[in-house]
């Protein structure tokens, strides 16, 4: 690795064809770069993240979710079949959830699966199988997986997921601590949030929209913290004023 070199600093913007690095790097395959010999080139316009002699390219916009085994996703039921459900996971490929995985038993002949999951329902699941030759197969075996029964689902471009989470979960921790909401960020660009009030929920949505639009800006975590404190401070003041007016 001593002869390897990365030509961009952390959080620099790269464009298609840029020579990113040269040498021997043990990094996972990604559609966002290509390799010629021992040289790595960017295939998109994005942000490069450098850490401990490794790099990752995060697209700035566009791009659908590329399934990866083990990822947690939030899928939307778009079809009910005899032995399972077809889900939209914001990918070029629809995903399939076998009923046996959801029910924990084989499907009975003539059983109506709409009793359990119907069109428009959201499901938290993991990508169990995917190899580019078949559509992703989902599983809900595991803690916290299954049908979404409460909260709101917020859609963002999948490429913005790393920014919403932040380095060492810094952005996600800020969103959680400042709002008190329970927040799950799925890898396919859907966020499940359970908040105490509608006003807090709306403030969270606004904060996420800011992150989405300004994901390339440094100091964004602190900006979001200040925004939420000001926004929720205004909300609390408005609530107090209304309470005083009614007494």
Swiss-Prot record:
**Cellular compartments annotated:** Cytoplasm
What highest taxon heads this organism's lineage?
Archaea
The UniProt entry's GO biological process terms, in alphabetical order, are: CUT catabolic process; exonucleolytic trimming to generate mature 3'-end of 5.8S rRNA from tricistronic rRNA transcript (SSU-rRNA, 5.8S rRNA, LSU-rRNA); poly(A)-dependent snoRNA 3'-end processing; RNA catabolic process; U4 snRNA 3'-end processing
What molecular functions are annotated in GO for this chain?
poly(A) binding
Q: What is its main location?
A: cytoplasm
Q: What region holds the KH domain?
A: 149-211
Q: Which cellular component terms (GO) are annotated to the entry? A: cytoplasm; exosome (RNase complex)
Which intervals hold domain S1 motif?
Answer: 70-143
Assembly and partners? Component of the archaeal exosome complex. Forms a trimer of Rrp4 and/or Csl4 subunits. The trimer associates with a hexameric ring-like arrangement composed of 3 Rrp41-Rrp42 heterodimers.
Query: Which HAMAP family does the entry mention?
Result: Exosome_Rrp4 (MF_00623)
The record's family statement is: Belongs to the RRP4 family.
Summarizing the function annotation, the protein's role is: Non-catalytic component of the exosome, which is a complex involved in RNA degradation. Increases the RNA binding and the efficiency of RNA degradation. Confers strong poly(A) specificity to the exosome.
Designated name of the protein: Exosome complex component Rrp4
- The record lists the organism as Sulfurisphaera tokodaii (strain DSM 16993 / JCM 10545 / NBRC 100140 / 7)
